Swiss-Prot record:
Pathway: tRNA modification; 5-methoxycarbonylmethyl-2-thiouridine-tRNA biosynthesis
UniProt keyword list: Cytoplasm, tRNA processing
Protein name: Cytoplasmic tRNA 2-thiolation protein 2
Superkingdom assignment: Eukaryota
GO molecular function: nucleotidyltransferase activity; sulfurtransferase activity; tRNA binding
Subcellular location field: Cytoplasm
GO terms, biological process: protein urmylation; tRNA wobble position uridine thiolation
Role: Plays a central role in 2-thiolation of mcm(5)S(2)U at tRNA wobble positions of tRNA(Lys), tRNA(Glu) and tRNA(Gln). May act by forming a heterodimer with ncs6 that ligates sulfur from thiocarboxylated urm1 onto the uridine of tRNAs at wobble position. Prior mcm(5) tRNA modification by the elongator complex is required for 2-thiolation. May also be involved in protein urmylation.
PANTHER family referenced in this protein's UniProt entry, alphabetically: CYTOPLASMIC TRNA 2-THIOLATION PROTEIN 2
Similarity comment: family membership: Belongs to the CTU2/NCS2 family.
Listed Gene3D superfamilies: HUPs (3.40.50.620)
Record GO cellular component, one term: cytosol
InterPro entries: CTU2, Rossmann-like_a/b/a_fold
């Protein structure tokens, strides 16, 4: 957060808006408490530095998964307890409002098995699209992509310079293992590491060196946080792994093994943070679904427009398409 407080490599005057996505989980709730406390301390100084504007986006948990509680009462609590931040709550299906042309992208991604009826409400359209994906891993992967695109598009709509993510060391380790397994290894330089993302926004992970147990100890000191946080349910051993996505499997693995070997999980995230973006030729093409650059391993020149399909999908998104996953 020093980067934003001291305006390193950022405009020296005017507002410096940043976005914090809040899931009501332990990590993002603790991060909000910490960052808001920093804003409060800056404002108490006789001549405070410009600092930054804190915007918080909550994507309704129940719109991501029906098994998640709606937690509606928490939104009012947040506004009362963190007055120096602005809060917005959106359902996941509002991604249609923020990402232009998404209906055509989803229709081509799924293929003829899915027909997008634009006359239906956005929620029903998204439900129909998600129902057309039968693989647990593919469904979780696409949900994650749509969630990221909504958050990034919302940040851009506010003119934010960066996004601060509330991922703990455990979460980043699980995300690293899952993304490599899904073919999204090239995205680790911005999905897990601090720095500039392919979307022109600075991504920061201030909690990258803290374990979940440490964050829980912090939250226990502040009762107001306990009224906001949705606790994670206990991991059940009596469950079929074939019904779990790769993301869920890796999170379960890190949660169980991280308690025994915390140093190993720390090494995973620290090593990934040293990676640099690929210098492979991209031709400037972006994946239609996840909006990241598509690498051109053969170093070919850009194809003529008439030779290109309507939309391009990266390797990972191609793998998760129905019929291939």
């Amino acid at each position: 957060m020093e980067k934003y407080r001291l305006r390193r490599d950022l405009p020296r005057s005017g507002p410096c808006p940043v976005l914090l996505p809040l899931s009501y989980g332990l990590s993002s709730s603790v991060l909000l408490h910490m960052v808001h406390g920093q804003v409060e301390r800056l404002l108490t100084k006789p001549h405070p530095p410009p600092g930054f504007e804190l915007h918080v986006l909550i994507v309704e948990p129940s719109s991501i998964s029906p098994s998640n509680p709606s937690h509606r009462g928490a939104f009012q609590l947040l506004q009362q307890q963190f007055p120096h931040a602005s809060f917005t709550q959106l359902p996941l299906h509002s991604v249609f409002d923020y990402v232009s042309g998404l209906n055509d992208i989803l229709a081509e991604y799924v293929g003829p098995a899915f027909v997008d009826d634009t006359s239906l409400p956005s929620k029903e359209r998204l439900d129909a699209f998600r129902a057309s994906i039968t693989s647990a891993t593919s469904a979780a992967d696409v949900d994650s992509v749509l969630l990221n695109r909504l958050i990034i598009a919302f940040a851009r709509s506010l003119g934010c310079l960066g996004i601060i993510w509330g991922d703990s060391d455990d979460r980043l380790a699980a995300k690293t293992l899952a993304n490599v397994s899904k073919g999204r290894g090239s995205s680790l330089t911005w999905q897990v590491s601090d720095g500039t993302s392919p979307f022109g926004l600075e991504f920061s992970f201030p909690l990258r060196d803290l374990f979940t147990a440490e964050l829980q100890s912090y939250a226990n000191f502040f009762p107001e946080l306990l009224n906001i946080i949705i606790p994670d349910g206990p991991l059940s051993d009596n469950i079929l792994t074939k019904n779990l996505s790769i993301d869920q499997l890796m999170m379960r693995y890190v949660s169980s093994q991280g308690a025994k070997y915390p140093g190993v999980m720390s090494n995973v995230t620290r090593t990934v943070n040293k990676l640099e973006s690929s210098r492979m030729i991209t031709d400037g093409l972006r994946c239609a679904l996840c909006d990241t650059f598509i690498c051109n391993p053969e170093g070919r020149q850009t194809m003529d427009l008439e030779e290109r399909p309507t939309n391009h999908f990266c390797y990972a998104c191609e793998r998760s398409r129905p019929g291939l996953s």
